Structure formats: structure tokens, C-alpha cells
């Protein structure tokens, strides 16, 4: 088990967002979090790398309570790709080098090319991110997350802002990350068909509560 949530909850003065969510993510596995808009999917995901703080419960990363891990180190180990690509001004290569540079590490030219080739963008290192299409920018987001050598990836509706062709390309990348690199992930999606294509297990959220969880086929059939 790479990541385990234990009775995770979050509430704000006007609303309970997540209630007693418990689940685990295993090596090489994609876990889908599925539910209607407003069910707490993204709120739950944001708790997994402490973008938001839980009001109850905790998360264990490789057996360690994540409150014992420095936030910057936690976000290196738990990578995230959001619905829309948030890239820094500059070149593609500069974006990939940002995270490692914050830790005093240098991302070599060959590693930049390897990461870009892995997301179908070989030779894009010198391109200005302002000139990328939406699909290309999202693929750079994946390469940037992978540049930090994460232990798990959090994916928050990573294809919902893309056209059909770009969506297929990103789904292929997600499958290859799991199959070839063994990096597990948590995928938030409202698209049940996408969950079936990409995930091995799923949990269904309703009003912040996990109402079903298990193997993807069983959960989606219920």
C-alpha cells in the first residue's frame, strides 16, 4: 500500500465536505473517485497532499503519517495534475526543471527529453508554454509532475477541459504511467466510462460520504 486514508474528513463552518473517508492506493494501481458535481471528489483529493487540511482523520504515505512529512517534500512525493494546466511563464524545459531546482537538484537535458518523449512531446523543451495547445499544456503538466519522481499521482478531472483527441492522448499517458512506471494514482472524474477505462478500483462519493468501493466493475455495476 502506497497511500492510505483513514477516516478522513473536512468541514467548513457552512458545510461538511468529506465524511470519514477510508481507502488505500496500491502500487501500480489507479483508484477512481466518482460522483456527481458537488459530491466532494475534489475536496477529498485536496486532502491527500494537504492542499487543504483535514478536520478529522489522516493519510499515511508509505506507512508514515503525512503530518510528519514537510509540506514541500509531501508535494514532491504526491504529485498532482489539475483540470487545467497551470504552467509558469517560460519554456517547457524551464517548467520541468522548476520542482527539482527547488530542492537543489538539476534536471539534465537528457532527462528533460526523456520526460517529454514519454508524454509525446519530444523536442518541445525550448518551446514557450504560451504557444502550446490545451492538450499539449496538459501533457507538460504530466511531465512536470513526473520530473519530481512522485510515489503517487493525484489527477483532478485531468481531461475535462480537453477536446476528444487530446482526451484520448492524455488517457493513453495515464495508462502508460501505471503500466510502464508502476506509479499509482487517484483519479477524480465525473465520467464513469473514463473510470472504467483507466482504473482498477473505484469509490463512489455522495454528499461527501463513500457509499460504495471496490473493484471497478463491481462498483460501477451496483
Protein language model regions, located:
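Conserved ABC ATPase "signature" region
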Residues: 107-124, 175
